[in-house]
């Protein structure tokens, strides 16, 4: 269950962050409507991913995904835009990922 859940979180992050990045590129970097359209499709696909999480509670899944989004966004910036996170960015992302672990995988 943990592996499936973690893989779904990674897929969700790629779709959401990637989709938002594509829209950003299309609008802010003037790359055009093709980029925007691809971003909108990716963002729409992201909306379906949470439904496949093994946990049945929408609020829990989306709350935990927020932590993945924080860390994933920083990583995306490093890979795609040459962003260099500082120690506070990294510490904050680590705290968020610890929260993901507690919310999703703590024994109940």
Curated annotation (Swiss-Prot):
Q: Which organism is it from?
A: Mycolicibacterium vanbaalenii (strain DSM 7251 / JCM 13017 / BCRC 16820 / KCTC 9966 / NRRL B-24157 / PYR-1) (Mycobacterium vanbaalenii)
Q: Name one GO cellular component term.
A: plasma membrane
Q: Which HAMAP family does the UniProt entry name for this protein?
A: UPF0060 (MF_00010)
Q: Which Pfam families match?
A: UPF0060
PANTHER family per the record?
A: UPF0060 MEMBRANE PROTEIN YNFA
Q: Where in the cell is it found?
A: Cell membrane
Protein family: Belongs to the UPF0060 family.
The reply on keyword Transferase is: no
| Keyword Translocase in record | no
Q: What is this protein called?
A: UPF0060 membrane protein Mvan_3406
TM helices/strands, residue ranges:
7-27, 32-52, 61-81, 87-107
Q: Which residues form a coiled coil?
A: none
Q: Which domain of life is it from?
A: Bacteria
Q: Which UniProt keywords apply?
A: Cell membrane, Membrane, Transmembrane, Transmembrane helix
> Mostly located where?
membrane
Q: How does it sit in the membrane?
A: Multi-pass membrane protein
């Amino acid at each position: 269950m943990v592996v499936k859940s973690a893989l779904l979180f990674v897929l969700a992050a790629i779709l959401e962050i990637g989709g938002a990045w594509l829209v950003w590129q299309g609008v802010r970097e003037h790359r055009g409507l093709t980029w925007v359209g691809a971003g909108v499709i990716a963002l729409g696909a992201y909306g379906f991913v949470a439904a496949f999480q093994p946990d049945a509670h929408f609020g829990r899944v989306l709350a935990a995904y927020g932590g993945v989004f924080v860390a994933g966004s920083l990583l995306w910036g490093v890979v795609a835009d040459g962003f260099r996170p500082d120690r506070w960015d990294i510490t904050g992302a680590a705290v968020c990922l610890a929260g993901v672990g507690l919310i999703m995988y703590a024994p109940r």
